[in-house]
Amino acid sequence: MDIIKGNLDGISKPASNSRIRPGSRSSNASLEVLSTEPGSFKVDTASNLNSGKEDHSESSNTENRRTSNDDKQESCSEKIKLAEEGSDEDLDLVQHQIISECSDEPKLKELDSQLQDAIQKMKKLDKILAKKQRREKEIKKQGLEMRIKLWEEIKSAKYSEAWQSKEEMENTKKFLSLTAVSEETVGPSHEEEDTFSSVFHTQIPPEEYEMQMQKLNKDFTCDVERNESLIKSGKKPFSNTEKIELRGKHNQDFIKRNIELAKESRNPVVMVDREKKRLVELLKDLDEKDSGLSSSEGDQSGWVVPVKGYELAVTQHQQLAEIDIKLQELSAASPTISSFSPRLENRNNQKPDRDGERNMEVTPGEKILRNTKEQRDLHNRLREIDEKLKMMKENVLESTSCLSEEQLKCLLDECILKQKSIIKLSSERKKEDIEDVTPVFPQLSRSIISKLLNESETKVQKTEVEDADMLESEECEASKGYYLTKALTGHNMSEALVTEAENMKCLQFSKDVIISDTKDYFMSKTLGIGRLKRPSFLDDPLYGISVSLSSEDQHLKLSSPENTIADEQETKDAAEECKEP
C-alpha cells in the first residue's frame, strides 16, 4: 500500500483504483492507493442486508428483494452522474464496476435462495424446540402440584399416638422440611408467572424467543428504510453496519465463550468462568440447606443411639431361673422325662406372656425383636435335647458293653472242651454202667445231653463203617484182577495190550500167551476195556456180593457230609446254652 502526503479537501467521491495523472482535475490532491476490489460497495451492502434477513419473515423477504433491486438501479444512476463530472479515466472505472455488479447478480440470487432455505429450517427447528420446552414446563408444573397435594395430605393426616413411632414422626418432619420450599414458590400469585429461572445467562427462555424475533424483524425494516434514504442522498450507507455491530455484541459474547471453552477442552465438563461461579453459588445454597437440616436433626435425633435391644423384665428373669431349677431336678430324677418337660413348661409360661404382649402397644421394632428371641429359644431348646439324648446313649452303651473277639474265642474253646469231656463220660457210663457218679462239671440240660449222646453214637457208627469199607475195597481189587486174568486166558493178546494191562492193574502174563498179531490186538483191547455183552464170570455168586458192598460204600460217602453239618449245628447250640446260666 502506497501513501502520498497531501491535502484531501477537494475529494468528494469514493476512492478509485487509479493512480494520479498530471492532466486530471484532482492532480493537486493526494490519494491512497489500495488493491483492486471490484464491487466492494455492493458486497458490503449485500452482507449487511443478508445478516438482517436471518431474523425476518417471508413477507419481509419479498419486500427486501424489491428494495434491493431499486437500490441497485439508483446506485448505477448515481455512479453514472459522478462519472460525468469526473475525468475520462473515471468513466472507464465506473463502467467496469457496473459490468462486474451486473455479472454478480445471479450469484447473489443463488446465495439469497440458500439463505432463505436455511432460515426456514432454523425456524422449523425453533418451533419444535419451543414445543418441547413447553411440554417439559407443563410436566414440571404437574410434578409440583402433586408434591403440594401430598404435602397437604401429610399435614392434614392425624395419626393415632398408639401406633405411630418416633421414626415415622422424624421421617415426616424431614419430608415436610424438604417440600416446604417448593410449596412456597408455587402459589396462586405465581401460577401465571414463569416459575423456572435460567441457570446460566446464555439461556434464552422459550416465551421470550418469539418476542425477540418480532423485535428483530421490526428493527430490520427500519434499517432498510434508512439505508434507502442514505443511498438516495449520496451519503455513506455504513450506519446499518454500525447498528448491526451493536446488536451483534451478543454474538461476540458467544465467540468469547467458545474461546474460553476451547481452553478447557481437556476437562471432562467444559465450563466458562461465569458458569463456574454460578455453580459455586448454587452449591453454596445447597450446603447451607444441608447444614441447617443437620443442625435441626442433631437436636431431635438423640434417640438414635445404639442400645442392647430387647431386655427382659425382672419377673421374667425369675421365671426363667425357676424353670432351670426344675429342669435340673427332673433331669437328675429321670432323664427320659426331662427331654419333654421343658417344652410343656415353656408353653404354659408363654401363654400369659403373649396375652400380656397383645394388650401392649405394638411398635415396628418390637416385632423383629420378638421373632429373634423366639428363634433363639427354639435353638437353645433343641441343643439341650440333643445333649440329653447323647448322654442317654452313652449310658446305655456303658451298661451293655460288647465283648471283644478274643473273649468270644476263649468262651468257644471252653465250651468245646466241656463237650469233649461230656462225650468221654457218656461213653464210660455205657461201658461200665455206673449209676452214681458225681458230676465234675456244671449240670447240663436234658436236651443237650441227649444231643451229645446221639453225636457220640453217630461217630462210633462212622468209624465202624469206615473199617468195613476198607476191607471191602481190598477184596474188590483182588477179585477184579482175578476175573480179568480169567477172562483173558483163552484169548490171544498183543504186546501193546499186555503192557497196558501190566501198567494199569499191575498184572503179569506169560510170554507164551503173547502173540504178535494185529487183528487179535484190536479184539483183545475191546475185551480188556469190558465192552462185551455179558461174560461168563458175571454168573459167579461172589460177584454180586462185591457189587452190593460197593453200592453201600457210595451211600455212606454221600451221607457223611450231611452228618458233619448236623454235628456243627449241635456244637453251636450247646455253646449258647452254656452261656445262659
Curated annotation (Swiss-Prot):
Highest taxon listed in the record's lineage: Eukaryota
Disordered: region residues: 1-77, 338-365, 555-581
Modified sites of kind Phosphoserine: S87
Biased composition (Polar residues): 14-30
Keyword vocabulary terms for this entry: Coiled coil, Phosphoprotein
Stored Pfam families: FSIP1 (PF15554)
UniProt keyword annotation of Phosphoprotein present: yes
UniProt xrefs under InterPro entries: Fsip1 (IPR026246)
Keyword Protein biosynthesis attributed: no
PANTHER family, per database record: FIBROUS SHEATH INTERACTING PROTEIN 1, FIBROUS SHEATH-INTERACTING PROTEIN 1
Family membership: Belongs to the FSIP1 family.
Name recorded for this polypeptide: Fibrous sheath-interacting protein 1
Gene of this entry: FSIP1
